[in-house]
Curated annotation (Swiss-Prot):
This is ATP-dependent DNA helicase DinG. Belongs to the helicase family. DinG subfamily. Type 1 sub-subfamily. It comes from Salmonella typhimurium (strain LT2 / SGSC1412 / ATCC 700720). Binds 1 [4Fe-4S] cluster. The keyword Isomerase applies. InterPro entries: ATP-dep_Helicase_C, DEAD/DEAH_box_helicase_dom, DinG/Rad3-like, DinG_proteobact, Helic_SF1/SF2_ATP-bd_DinG/Rad3, Helicase-like_DEXD_c2, Helicase_ATP-bd, P-loop_NTPase. NCBIfam families: PRK11747.1. Pfam families: DEAD (PF00270), DEAD_2 (PF06733), Helicase_C_2 (PF13307). GO terms for molecular function: 4 iron, 4 sulfur cluster binding; 5'-3' DNA helicase activity; ATP binding; ATP hydrolysis activity; DNA binding; DNA helicase activity; DNA/RNA helicase activity; metal ion binding. It catalyses: Couples ATP hydrolysis with the unwinding of duplex DNA at the replication fork by translocating in the 5'-3' direction. This creates two antiparallel DNA single strands (ssDNA). The leading ssDNA polymer is the template for DNA polymerase III holoenzyme which synthesizes a continuous strand; ATP + H2O = ADP + phosphate + H(+).
Length: 714
């Protein structure tokens, strides 16, 4: 389709009307460029797909929504906007699209949040009820569906009143009533516990109401995981050929796609025996009380017992083999080099893949049959069995996926990382098996790049080391296929608005020097805190261990610090805002996740402290396997893997500071390797251009601490 004069005029008119809606709107050349690039790509005028880096301040959301809606209407397609986190998804759904509705009055949009973000009306009714009979009936389905106290019951009753009165849409983030994590866990549900069409509340269930709205919407706001699942099953969303797709926060896409090639599950022999026995009893119950129309052959008790016995014997053999690779009776880990399993283990995994897939099929068959019996059996007993069968299906789905991955030699031309771990819980040994695919470009090509005609991949950060190479390698997007890669200029004047501070640290932030380095960092941070120049501060760490050591050094000012994990992130940010706006000092402290999606403008954040260059963990089995594979191809892992990842993380961290034209402040990076190592200049060159200062650090005396024992992690 060509961009007609009428379509261009419509996009321009909406953009002009938008300027009238936003107070103090500042026209930006990068925004106009993005609107044009997005329009040309979605209309099929230029290239296959577009990867466009739009720095903070460009206004990327509205830059893809305006042309996207115009072209979707012209082509009678659905515009799907996908994000990586709930905060951005909710911002688009609750703020950006309602703003556009003012200039596009008949705009129809909806959101497809994950099931866990919605209240389950069945659970809510149980927890809101003050009548013992109602509580007893529903508590029979789940022991946790009774309120802990009268105050909790009243809170749930208010929530139910809002839901029934259409004052609340059932989303956790859309109510002012406080819901702690424990209560929400009981109010919501997951796929395994959802009764779906068999539920009395199905028609008014907020989750299913939202899913039905998708069919009528012009714009659907989804998340990457849902989009990937929908492309795999051709469910929830319209057919790929009838979509226009925007992947916001597109740098997360390879990680989300990797979920399809990632599985960890317990394989302890005694645990497995218990699960198989419970499933056999469940099948017997179904055959006795809810006999299916057609009996699956495997439901025969003798056949099922023989099948489960073979599964158990294989699992027991695998446990015995894996134990030979790990020290006896203690926590341990064994990784298989290049993901290559011994022949004996590979044969076991291949057989388990077939056997557990058969059990998965049996569970699914019974579940489908049970779902058709709601009108002819005791509803409470039937629903109880449906829930149990749902959970069995989930377990066998996970096991089938695990052994299928374990049986794969490669994915997207790269090995599948495989390792086993042994843990001790309450004095008992538990064995786990793990599989993670290193590359997912083939999956993305099959599900997205080849299926959807035109896709926009965007984010404030898509490049690392000023290059799209890492994105191309991980995603499979490539110029040869007609994909375009565009990096927009920042609308901000970083030279005038901020500065980069690299203190003259005596120690590098290595494991050997960690204690001394953190002591120096704490001393400089304390000096900055005592100067009272900054009311809003952010401190970012590369590891939880380092963050805890830092907190020990500044324990006397702990009340000023809002630390990740103390409360949910959104509450920490709310409290930070309130403190700063009331003239108090406030310091947010967190890990890499706080370097993304945190939008604090002006006085809310004027100083960012970065512990060190965040290289990926060298003890991760996935990173080690990837390194082995790269070396086998005569590629240098540090250049391909570590440095691009560190650059990407650093760009995101530094990007927390300048969020608007009114922002002023400084970024403090406690890592002298930026100035002393050859790669340091390359990392600096990928950052916005700030003036650099190198102040002295207060003297500190620290006794070296014994090296902590490190456990490997993925």
């Amino acid at each position: 389709m060509a961009l007609t004069a009428a379509l261009k005029a419509q996009i321009a008119a909406w953009y002009k009307a938008l300027q009238d809606q936003i107070p103090d709107f500042i026209p930006r050349a990068p925004q106009r460029q993005m609107i044009a690039d997005v329009a040309r790509t979605l209309a099929g005028e230029e290239g296959r797909h577009l990867a466009i880096e739009a720095p903070t301040g460009v206004g990327k959301t509205l830059s893809y929504l305006i042309p996207g809606i115009a072209i979707a209407r012209e082509e009678q397609k659905t515009l799907v906007v996908s994000t990586a986190n709930v905060a951005l998804q909710d911002q688009i759904f609750s703020k950006d699209l309602p703003l556009l509705r003012k200039i596009i009055p008949d705009l129809r949009f909806t959101a497809a949040f994950g099931r866990g973000r919605y209240v389950c009306p069945r659970n809510l009714a149980a927890l809101a009820s003050s009548e013992p009979t109602q509580q007893d009936l529903l508590a029979f389905l789940d022991d946790e569906l009774t309120p802990n106290n009268q105050e909790e019951q009243k809170r749930c009753a208010r929530l139910k009143g809002d839901l029934d009165g259409y004052k609340w849409d059932g989303l956790r983030d859309h109510t002012d009533i406080a819901i702690d994590d424990d209560l929400w866990r009981r109010l919501s549900t997951d796929k395994a516990s959802c009764l779906n069409r068999n539920c009395h509340y199905y028609r008014e269930c907020p989750f299913f109401v939202a899913r039905r709205e998708i069919q009528e919407a012009e714009v659907v706001v989804a998340n990457h995981a849902l989009v990937m699942a929908a492309m795999e099953s051709e469910a929830v969303l319209p057919e790929p050929k009838h979509l226009l797709l925007v992947l916001d926060e597109g740098h997360h896409l390879p990680d989300v796609a990797r979920d399809a090639l990632e599985m960890s599950a317990e394989i302890t022999a005694s645990w497995y025996r218990l699960q198989l026995d419970l499933f056999s009893k469940l099948v017997a119950t179904c055959m006795e009380q809810f006999r299916p129309k057609t009996t699956p052959p495997l439901a025969n008790p003798e056949r099922l017992n023989a099948h489960c016995e073979e599964v158990y014997e294989l699992i027991a053999s695998l446990n015995a083999i894996l134990n030979l690779y790990m020290p006896a009776a203690q926590e341990a880990e064994h990784r298989f080099a290049m993901g290559e399993l011994p022949d004996e283990v590979m044969e076991i995994c291949q057989r388990l893949a077939k056997l557990t897939e058969t059990l998965r099929g049996l569970a699914e068959s019974f579940l489908n049959d049970l779902s058709e019996k709601t009108g002819s059996h005791d509803i409470v007993r039937l629903h109880r069995v449906i829930l149990q069968m749902n959970r069995a299906l989930g377990m066998f789905e996970a096991q089938s996926k695990l052994w299928r991955l374990a049986s794969m030699a490669q994915s997207s031309g790269a090995p599948v990382s495989k390792w086993a771990t042994r843990e001790i819980r309450e004095g008992q040994l538990h064995v786990w098996f793990h599989c993670v695919g290193i590359r997912v470009s083939d999956q993305l090509e099959r599900l997205l790049w080849r299926s959807v005609p035109h896709i926009i991949v965007t984010s404030a950060t898509l490049r690392s080391l000023n290059s799209f190479s890492r994105l191309q390698e991980m995603s499979g997007l490539k110029e040869k296929a007609g994909d375009r890669f565009v990096a927009l200029d920042s609308p901000f004047n970083h030279v005038e608005q901020g500065k980069l501070v690299i203190p003259q640290m005596r120690y590098e932030p290595t494991i050997d020097n960690e204690e001394q380095h953190i002591a120096e960092m704490a001393a400089y941070f304390r000096e900055q805190l005592e100067s009272k120049k900054h009311h809003g501060m952010l401190v970012l760490f590369a590891s939880g261990r380092a963050m805890q050591r830092f907190l020990e050094h500044v324990a006397d000012v702990r009340l000023l610090l809002l630390v990740q994990g103390d409360q949910p992130r959104y509450r920490l940010v709310e409290l930070h805002r309130k403190r700063v706006e009331s003239g108090e000092r406030s310091v947010l402290v967190g890990l890499q996740s706080f370097a993304e999606g945190l939008d604090l403008k002006g006085e809310l954040l004027t100083q960012v402290h970065i512990h060190k260059i965040a290289f990926p963990p060298i003890d991760s089995p996935v990173v080690i396997t990837e390194g082995e594979w790269l070396k086998s191809l005569n590629r240098y892992p540090f250049e391909v893997q570590s440095l691009p990842s560190a650059s990407f993380n650093l760009i995101q961290q530094v990007g927390r500071l300048i969020r608007s034209h009114a922002c002023r402040g400084e970024v403090v990076i406690y890592d002298k390797r930026l100035l002393t190592k050859n790669y340091g200049q390359r990392l600096l060159n990928a950052l916005p251009v700030f003036p650099i200062e190198q102040p002295a650090v207060p003297d500190v005396i620290v006794k070296p601490k014994a090296k902590p024992a490190r456990r490997r992690r993925r």
